[in-house]
Design a protein with these regions (language model features):
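Active-site neighborhoods and metal-handling regions in enzymes and metal-associated proteins
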Residues: 1-368
Length: 368
């Protein structure tokens, strides 16, 4: 049984509906091996849970991609001008569908209303938890592919530190990283890169601009790639430009210790809120609790932000196969910010840190 058929089988057995209708492209890739960006056109994977038969509905212009990559039983192309929902409902009728499972977090309102033309709201259910639970667990092959993505990311960052950053703008550094990532085989960037220097580094999700890196700055770089396997990476390092001041040293070391504590707490069976607490307590003790304004981490895989969510309210335990980030931060408006982010694989025998790029303050101080 292929990995895709195995995933379909697990989903079919975990939901209590006749038919699953998936429309999110990454979810469809997860269950078929076929990735299409449909834009405004309808892309859908239809899974008959009674016999696990799969049908992919797609824009006819993507026929070649589907033929080459999709591991599904039936193909249902639609041309511009055709009503894809007519074809969809015919497929549902063929499978004697009485109840439908959808991605409640993705299916747009207009398409949901189309479903209501034929089905009562009481027969439509969200299957997001089941899909997210499956995507949240990775195997050894997934782990190896994620490692390749992280290795490319770290190689580009090493090139940047060798080339030097002083006098370069945030945009110039972001462009440098994009070029290096492409040269090492990245399909695309997974976001950004976020390159923020000086006071801008206090913006957790700021955008790079024309501000140039100067002596005395924090330089925060958060970036990642989409690899050939479509797994993504996500890492953050914060550099200090020139000799650190006492305040910079204090803030950086507080975040570094919180990162270390979060990693040490992240073992299978540990409630996720305890991982958040382990890191957060150290930042609070250092006097910066009010400046750590987000959760400790999130899941990572084919999507940049997947389940699970490592926040202070999540009492679910970490499971073997989870891939998560640990990314504490301190952000002081008018001064600057520090975030350090690693990606981890939760294993049976221990936790694997995908990242090897240095974090010690002496190793992240740049003089050029």
């Amino acid at each position: 049984m292929s990995i895709y058929k195995e995933r379909v089988s697990k989903l079919a057995s975990s939901v209590n509906v006749d038919t699953v209708l998936l429309t999110e492209p990454v979810n469809i890739f997860y269950f078929t091996g076929c990735f299409i960006e449909p834009h405004e056109r309808l892309l859908a994977l239809i899974i008959d849970t009674k016999n696990e038969e799969t049908t992919i509905m797609y824009p006819a212009l993507d026929q070649e991609i589907v033929n080459e990559t999709a591991t599904v039983v039936n193909h249902l192309p639609h041309r511009d001008g055709e009503d894809p929902f007519r074809l969809l409902f015919e497929q549902f009728a063929h499978g004697q569908t009485k109840s439908i499972g959808i991605e409640g977090s993705h299916l747009v309102y207009e398409r949901y209303m189309k479903l209501l033309d034929e089905y009562a709201a009481e027969s439509i259910f969200a299957v997001d938890p089941a899909v997210n639970a499956l995507r949240g667990i990775k195997n050894e092959e997934d782990k190896a592919q994620l490692q390749e993505a992280v290795d490319i990311t770290e190689k580009a960052l090493s090139d940047l530190t060798e080339a030097g950053v002083i006098g370069k703008s945030e945009k110039e550094i972001a462009d440098f990283l994009r070029g290096k990532l492409k040269s090492y085989g990245a399909e695309d960037v997974s976001f950004g890169p976020l390159v923020l220097t000086g006071e801008n580094s206090a913006l957790p999700h700021g955008e790079p601009g024309d501000t140039e890196v100067r002596l005395g700055d924090f330089l925060l770089i958060d970036f990642g790639i989409v690899s050939e396997s479509r797994y993504v990476s996500d890492m953050t390092r914060t550099f200090i430009i020139g000799e650190p001041t006492d305040q910079q040293r204090e803030i950086y070391n507080a975040v570094h210790e919180a990162n270390r504590a979060g990693i040490e707490a992240a073992v299978h069976g540990t409630p996720m809120k305890e991982v958040d607490l382990a890191a957060r307590e150290l930042i609070i003790e250092a006097g910066y609790g009010d400046y750590f304004t987000h959760r400790i981490g999130h899941g990572l895989g084919y999507g940049l932000h997947e389940q699970p969510s490592l926040d202070s309210e999540n009492g679910d335990p970490l499971e073997v196969g989870h891939v998560i980030t640990i990314e504490p931060g301190i952000y002081q408006t008018g001064f600057g910010g520090v975030r350090i982010e690693d990606a981890l694989y939760i294993g049976e025998e221990g936790t694997h840190n995908f990242n090897k790029f240095p974090k010690d303050i002496d190793r992240i101080t740049l003089d050029k």
